[in-house]
């Protein structure tokens, strides 16, 4: 099974941007962790990051067309993008929303997600391990 792992705005700055909040793992290191865990679980992870909402939408549409599960950390677009929510609603395979930090323990505006109502599940506040937990969940589901 192919799993699309999609990271949104500012996640390319992991390891440099607010390491006290997001940790010191870089996006390249995160991608390597995800790819290794996926392989160990018999999955193939395609890990991508973009600061462009349009590109994220294209990737979500592609996953919907291919009936592929998505692990999505939309960054700040989580709290603002109806367009991203609508694209995610089109997915028939599972959508796991992941956030590295505990968004519920931060600023008020971060506590609302347009994505959660259309997600299969949500993992928040467990650092980069949240991605690996999402993969383990998907590996346990029938293809």
UniProtKB/Swiss-Prot annotation:
UniProt-annotated catalytic positions: 22, 99
Entry EC no(s): 4.2.1.10
Site (Transition state stabilizer): 17
TM region(s), chain numbering: none
Claim: Amino-acid biosynthesis is one of the keywords in the record: yes
Annotated substrate binding sites: 73, 79, 86, 100-101, 110
EC top class named in words: lyase
Biological processes per GO annotation: amino acid biosynthetic process; aromatic amino acid family biosynthetic process; chorismate biosynthetic process; quinate catabolic process
Pathway membership, UniProt: Metabolic intermediate biosynthesis; chorismate biosynthesis; chorismate from D-erythrose 4-phosphate and phosphoenolpyruvate: step 3/7
A GO molecular-function annotation: 3-dehydroquinate dehydratase activity
Segment forming the signal sequence: none
Catalytic reaction equation(s): 3-dehydroquinate = 3-dehydroshikimate + H2O
rRNA processing is among the record's keywords: no
Alphabetized UniProt keyword annotations: Amino-acid biosynthesis, Aromatic amino acid biosynthesis, Lyase
Pfam family, one: DHquinase_II
Assembly information from the UniProt record: Homododecamer.
Function: Catalyzes a trans-dehydration via an enolate intermediate.
Family to which this protein belongs: Belongs to the type-II 3-dehydroquinase family.
Entry protein name: 3-dehydroquinate dehydratase
Originating organism: Mycobacterium avium (strain 104)
Phylogenetic classification of the source organism: Bacteria, Bacillati, Actinomycetota, Actinomycetes, Mycobacteriales
Gene expressing this chain: aroQ
């Amino acid at each position: 099974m192919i799993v699309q792992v999609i990271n949104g705005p500012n996640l390319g700055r992991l390891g440099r941007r607010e390491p006290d909040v997001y940790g010191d793992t870089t996006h390249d290191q995160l991608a390597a962790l995800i790819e290794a865990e996926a392989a160990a679980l018999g999955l193939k992870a395609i890990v991508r990051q973009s600061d462009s909402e349009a590109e994220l939408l294209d990737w979500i549409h592609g996953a919907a067309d291919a009936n592929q599960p998505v692990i999505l950390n939309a960054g700040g677009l989580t709290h603002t993008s109806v367009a991203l929510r609508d694209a995610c609603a089109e997915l028939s395979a599972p959508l796991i929303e992941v956030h590295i930090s505990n968004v519920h323990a931060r600023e008020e505006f971060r506590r609302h997600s347009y994505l959660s109502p259309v997600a299969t599940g949500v993992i928040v506040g467990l650092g980069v391990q949240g991605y690996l937990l999402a993969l383990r969940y998907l590996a346990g589901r029938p293809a």
